[in-house]
Amino acid sequence: MSRQTDGGKQMLTKNQLVEAQITAMSSDGNGIAKVDGMVIFVPYSAVGDKLLVRIVKVLKHYSFGIIDRILESGEGRVQDSCPVYRRCGGCSFRHISYREELVHKAQFVEDNLRRLGGLEPQMLPITPSPKQQGYRNKAQYPIRMQDGKVTAGFFAKRSHRVIDCACCDLQPEFFEQVVEYTTRFLQENNISVYDEESGKGLVRHLYLRYGETTDQLMVCLVVNGDKLPCADRYIEGLRQVCGRVCSVVLNINREQSNVILGNSCRTLWGSDT
């Protein structure tokens, strides 16, 4: 049941089930609905959705809910193809079509220019990308030991827990080959990986950068030390796995912080640029 605020509005309560229609989206991909005058943010919802929503958090001016059941889907809703989308923190709009995503992003820009800039912009249509899959040319993978296994992927939403998702659809397929080879090599050669709590362990991140015009890939290992054990064997195997590799770089970062790259780099093999 709901209760009234001092202003006479109905206040939602935690675990309450309410019917809601999504009428807008926030810039972080949450659908927005209003029930009894209260704004509700609902992850993984789409404009036009009619939902049964379970309230999970109630604040003074707005609430958060989760989808209990989809009563009617909005036109922009699609079935996301990523198996870890709802756990990984890398994407926000995979549950809606690309066309719908562009509409909302254009609206975010226009709203900010009007509300924050005090402008009346003449908006031009967004030019869509010719590639919606495999377009990323850079990736930074935290490397951690989880359940006795060396794991590389992306951080879960609002956490530093690594989600094993080397096979992300937004990156080229050969990124996955490099990630899988690297984690397997570290595991088989008992090379330690970084632990954020203790500040100990060697390998912190795997950083990949691809030049589409040159078809070349730079591989960078970020380490909490001076050198990589078995570096020559790592490089030899890496070149066999991915022929696009043009350089292998070691980045030194001994700082106990969230900053990924340190200030010192050393090229282990290949081009310096």
Enumerate the language-model features and the residues they cover:
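Accessory RNA-recognition modules of RNA-modification enzymes
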Residues: 2-273
